[in-house]
Amino acid sequence: MLRQFIISTVGRRQPLLMILQSRLASNLDKTEYTTPGEIVDYDDPPHLPVPEYPVRPDEPLETRKQRLLYQSRKRGMLENDLLLSTFVAKYLKDFSAEQTAEYDQLINGVSNDWDIFYWATDTKPTPPQFDTEIMRLLKEHVKNHEKVQRIRQPDL
């Protein structure tokens, strides 16, 4: 029985090798379309409506800060989770009402979280409506002059 198994797997190895070689060859052809480090970013199609984020004018400051703490930790992409959660842990407690509103607009007014990441890391230019004091503070935080390891979110 073992001999039959060995023979049957040896017989199947050749087609598998051919499949792998053809896939590797097809992947090599794709390098001519993009350059290493290039950001492939497409505009959203017009048929995808982006829901408006609800404005909460009567929300108490402490409630808003708690909501922003939660939203900064649960972005849906690890890169922003780490950047924003460490930023909020360091600065949010000292934000005024105006600064808190700016931060709320920054993380909830943008339809694509990758935009926040690219702006914070200076990969793409920040649009004027989001180029605020809070964004400049976030950019400085991302530069990590203190060389702090940010491999996990801070404790609550």
Swiss-Prot record:
Subcellular location: Mitochondrion matrix
Any one GO BP annotation for this protein: mitochondrial electron transport, succinate to ubiquinone
Similarity-based family: Belongs to the SDHAF2 family.
Main location: mitochondrion
Database matches in Gene3D superfamilies: Flavinator of succinate dehydrogenase
Keywords linked to the UniProt accession: Chaperone, Mitochondrion, Transit peptide
Coiled-coil annotated residue ranges, if any: none
Protein name: Succinate dehydrogenase assembly factor 2-B, mitochondrial
UniProt entry tagged with the keyword Metal-binding: no
Subunit organization: Interacts with the flavoprotein subunit within the SDH catalytic dimer.
One protein family per Pfam: Sdh5
The organelle targeting sequence, given as a residue range: 1-24
Function text: Plays an essential role in the assembly of succinate dehydrogenase (SDH), an enzyme complex (also referred to as respiratory complex II) that is a component of both the tricarboxylic acid (TCA) cycle and the mitochondrial electron transport chain, and which couples the oxidation of succinate to fumarate with the reduction of ubiquinone (coenzyme Q) to ubiquinol. Required for flavinylation (covalent attachment of FAD) of the flavoprotein subunit of the SDH catalytic dimer.
Any single Gene Ontology cellular-component annotation: mitochondrion
Highest classification ranks of the organism: Eukaryota, Metazoa, Ecdysozoa, Arthropoda, Hexapoda
Organism, scientific name: Drosophila yakuba
HAMAP family, per the entry: SDHAF2
